[in-house]
């Protein structure tokens, strides 16, 4: 945690005072809050941005998120007849793609803890004609409401950093995977090139909130986005967390020089 704080203050020229967390507290961006409050605070962020979430994804990533997602699908091994959990699936980009891959004999469940995001995703997919093999569930990643050994693939995309207890969530994902199934975690991570880190930090803390203010009239939600990325575990730390949760053959791919990383692990 100290290293992350030093990295943020040195590169971004901010001075957040990070208090150590306890069993009752966690981080909401750079703030230390009660665990019982974080879920509500994250919910408010996504209630605010749900309506223009897809537009902001395109604007903030310059459309590159589509390339990251295509690579993730290529690594998924999903095929006809599979059952897929798109966790923290939001507006359903992955659900739409996986629906076609699994076909009528398979199933995709779009799950999100936030009802606003789930509502936007359901409407979007129905307008695209994605029906028949897709179901929707409001669910907390830390306590998934599915039986053991249910899914061939679980994916969580740009959602794990918002989870209060990441270790508990990873164990929950492991439980619902079938033996032989795989977990894919696509998430913002730590750039591996120092010059890129400096540019990325400037963009994240100076430009990104201003775009949020102009497009959705909400700069604070996008300031939280930047802070939550800095507080998310680095690539090797998340890899070890997945191993500790029971996953095997865990590896990761740095995308866009580590701005995003895709972690993959198997349940055997």
Swiss-Prot record:
Gene3D superfamilies: Vaccinia Virus protein VP39
Reaction catalyzed: a 2-demethylmenaquinol + S-adenosyl-L-methionine = a menaquinol + S-adenosyl-L-homocysteine + H(+); a 2-methoxy-6-(all-trans-polyprenyl)benzene-1,4-diol + S-adenosyl-L-methionine = a 5-methoxy-2-methyl-3-(all-trans-polyprenyl)benzene-1,4-diol + S-adenosyl-L-homocysteine + H(+)
GO biological process: aerobic respiration; menaquinone biosynthetic process; methylation
Compositional bias of kind Polar residues: 10-23
Presence of keyword S-adenosyl-L-methionine: yes
InterPro entries tied to this protein: SAM-dependent_MTases_sf, UbiE/COQ5_MeTrFase, UbiE/COQ5_MeTrFase_CS
Enzyme class: transferase
Alphabetical list of Pfam families matching this protein: Ubie_methyltran
Annotated stretches, region: Disordered: 1-23
Function: Methyltransferase required for the conversion of demethylmenaquinol (DMKH2) to menaquinol (MKH2) and the conversion of 2-polyprenyl-6-methoxy-1,4-benzoquinol (DDMQH2) to 2-polyprenyl-3-methyl-6-methoxy-1,4-benzoquinol (DMQH2).
UniProt record similarity statement: Belongs to the class I-like SAM-binding methyltransferase superfamily. MenG/UbiE family.
Name recorded for this polypeptide: Ubiquinone/menaquinone biosynthesis C-methyltransferase UbiE
Natural source organism: Pasteurella multocida (strain Pm70)
Lineage start: Bacteria, Pseudomonadati, Pseudomonadota, Gammaproteobacteria, Pasteurellales
Gene: ubiE
């Amino acid at each position: 945690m100290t290293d992350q704080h030093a990295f943020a203050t040195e590169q971004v020229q901010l001075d957040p005072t990070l208090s150590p967390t306890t069993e009752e507290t966690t981080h909401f961006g750079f703030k230390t809050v009660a665990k019982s409050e974080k879920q509500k605070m994250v919910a408010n962020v996504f209630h605010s941005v749900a309506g223009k979430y897809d537009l902001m994804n395109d604007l903030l990533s310059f459309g590159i998120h589509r390339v990251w997602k295509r690579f993730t699908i290529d690594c998924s091994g999903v095929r006809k007849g599979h059952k897929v959990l798109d966790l923290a699936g939001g507006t359903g980009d992955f659900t739409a793609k996986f629906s076609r891959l699994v076909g009528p004999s398979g199933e995709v469940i779009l799950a999100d803890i936030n009802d606003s995001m789930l509502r936007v995703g359901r409407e979007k997919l129905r307008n695209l004609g994605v029906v028949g093999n897709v179901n929707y569930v409001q669910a907390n990643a830390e306590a998934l409401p599915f039986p053991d050994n249910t899914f061939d693939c679980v994916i969580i995309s740009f959602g794990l950093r918002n989870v209060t207890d990441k270790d508990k969530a990873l164990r929950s994902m492991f439980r619902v995977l079938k033996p032989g199934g795989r977990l894919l975690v696509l998430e913002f991570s730590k750039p591996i090139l120092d010059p890129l880190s400096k540019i990325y930090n400037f963009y994240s803390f100076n430009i990104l909130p201003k775009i949020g203010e102009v497009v959705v009239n909400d700069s604070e939600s996008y300031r939280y986005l930047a802070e939550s990325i800095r507080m998310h575990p680095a690539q090797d730390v998340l890899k070890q967390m997945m191993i500790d949760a029971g996953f095997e053959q865990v590896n990761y791919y740095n995308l866009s020089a580590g701005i995003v990383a895709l972690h993959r692990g198997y349940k055997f």
